[in-house]
A protein has these predicted regions:
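Cytosolic, long alpha-helical scaffolding segments
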Residues: 1-254
């Protein structure tokens, strides 16, 4: 019980930090886009817009990293309050990102036409994949929240011991992706690491299918299906990171 309380407090602190960060980002956005709209210098407009796109993607990766960890720990600890609050937070984040993306699309009209055409494709691929990370969080959270709300069986210990190391590796990949956005990493090595991770998650899914086949207790069926969806969305998030990394690398080269 004490451990659950500590987890809830830590998640609440993280949530408040994210709220304060978003408030600061909104003020910064207004200033940046005001300059993009008013400047006649197309190179300046592109520099501002490119920096904003990279910053926006970085911010969302940071959000996804924290939210995924909060989700998993909230689910493992059957923390209904945390999952409910996180569900609202993810919904709001999705709308916040859509608003910033619409501004960025408008900003593309202010840069040189050739640059806009070159950047447009990679911009849309990058932002679409960033959106998919947020959607993955929502898809995996909703059934887990319903599961806890209905007081079904908790996640078995063997599943917890399996998913936690996989979750840690995913957040590590997200951090490396953030480094790719802000500075630079070896793209080829990063993509290979993601591919290796996807194989690891696929192996976990295969083991879990065998686990379900051998399970004698029918009361565990629902939690096993939920766990399979967690593994599937974890795999999907890694795959999305791979596509996002390629698009970000192309954008940074322009």
């Amino acid at each position: 019980m004490v451990a659950l309380g500590i987890v809830a407090i830590l998640i609440l602190i993280n949530s408040n930090r994210r709220y304060n960060k978003k408030a600061k980002e909104e003020k910064k956005d207004d200033k940046i886009f005001s300059e993009i709209v008013t400047t006649d210098d197309k190179e300046r407009a592109w520099a501002l817009l490119k920096g904003h796109v990279e910053g926006n993607i970085f911010s969302e990766l940071e959000f996804v990293e924290g939210a995924y960890t909060d989700f998993l720990e909230g689910f493992i600890n059957e923390d209904r309050r945390t999952l409910t609050k996180l569900y609202r937070t993810i919904r709001n984040e999705k709308e916040f990102f859509k608003t910033k993306r619409r501004k960025e699309i408008t900003g593309l009209k202010k840069v040189d036409t050739v640059v806009a055409v070159q950047a447009g494709t990679w911009f849309h691929i990058a932002t679409n994949n960033t959106s998919q990370l947020i959607y993955s969080l929502r898809r995996v959270l909703e059934p887990c929240k319903d599961h806890i709300d209905n007081n079904f069986n908790p996640l078995p210990q063997d599943c917890i011991e399996e998913i936690r190391p996989l979750a840690a590796k995913l957040t590590d990949l997200i951090e490396k992706e953030m480094n790719l956005v802000k500075t630079s990493v070896d793209l080829s090595a990063h993509l290979k690491e993601i591919s290796a991770y996807k194989k690891e998650v696929s192996a976990a899914m295969e083991r879990h299918i065998n686990r379900m086949r051998s399970e004698q207790d029918s009361s565990n069926l629902n939690i096993y299906i939920i766990y399979q969806s967690i593994l599937q969305e974890t795999w999907q998030m890694a795959d999305t990171l791979k596509h996002l990394a390629r698009a970000v690398d192309k954008l940074k080269s322009l």
